[in-house]
């Protein structure tokens, strides 16, 4: 059975290395790493392909922004384009919630399901959720965040 404490530490380091600390990500990823992007129907095989995608991003990667991280203890982080907000999970499966800011000013919510094998990230399924305006018809039924 996996050691929850050490796996959580791996995932915390991994979340803080995303998306562009390529050396750290390489150390934290299993040799057979695969990442799926279900919304676009794409699969990334291997760290080298992941790195090439991010290094080729049109317009370059955005500048840093700070966010408060929620989880086992509160911390502040400053990372380029990506701010981890929360990590939950146990055993070999964890969820990372983050915010992404793109070079054109757009932003998205980011959720990654991370599966570990042999103490390294072997699989990641990533969802990108673009913010949208709430419909007026339910305005009196909800609170604005």
Predicted regions and their residues:
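C-terminal and inter-domain tail/linker signature
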Residues: 1-145
């Amino acid at each position: 059975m996996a050691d929850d404490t050490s796996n959580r530490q791996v995932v915390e380091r991994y979340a803080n290395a995303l998306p562009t600390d390529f050396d750290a990500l390489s150390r934290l990823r299993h040799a057979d790493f695969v990442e799926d992007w279900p919304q676009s129907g794409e699969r990334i095989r291997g760290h080298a392909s992941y790195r090439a995608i991010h290094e080729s991003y049109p317009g370059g990667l955005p500048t840093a922004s700070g966010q408060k991280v929620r989880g086992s203890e509160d911390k502040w982080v400053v990372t380029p384009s990506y701010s981890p907000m929360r990590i939950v999970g146990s055993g070999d499966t964890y969820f990372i919630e983050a915010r992404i800011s793109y070079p054109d000013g757009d932003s998205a919510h980011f959720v990654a399901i991370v599966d570990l094998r042999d103490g390294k990230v072997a699989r990641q399924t990533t969802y990108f959720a673009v913010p949208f305006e709430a419909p007026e018809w339910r305005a009196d039924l909800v609170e604005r965040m």
